Amino acid sequence: GTTAWLRTAATAWGIEKEPFEQAIAPAVARANLGLDRYRELLTGRKAFLFPDSQLEIPLARFLARECGMELVEVGTPYIDRMLMDEEIALLVY
């Protein structure tokens, strides 16, 4: 999500990988600390997302990758491939 977006911007601006990683490390650590208690509650649980708003794919990616949830089904009313292909690729790992 955010890291991928920031990495794309950093690459476009010619920022090397090491300075980029150093710059985002405090924010990543803070985010991980904030998510720890939720991971304990959500890891291994199943999620079924009904189609509603086109946010299902990014939400599913977050729940699976960051919170350890198992995705049973992810429905979406519409998929704009130009916007969602990278998110969809992150659902399968």
Regions found by a protein language model. Name each.
Residues 1-93:
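An N-terminal assembly and electron-transfer interface module characteristic of large anaerobic redox
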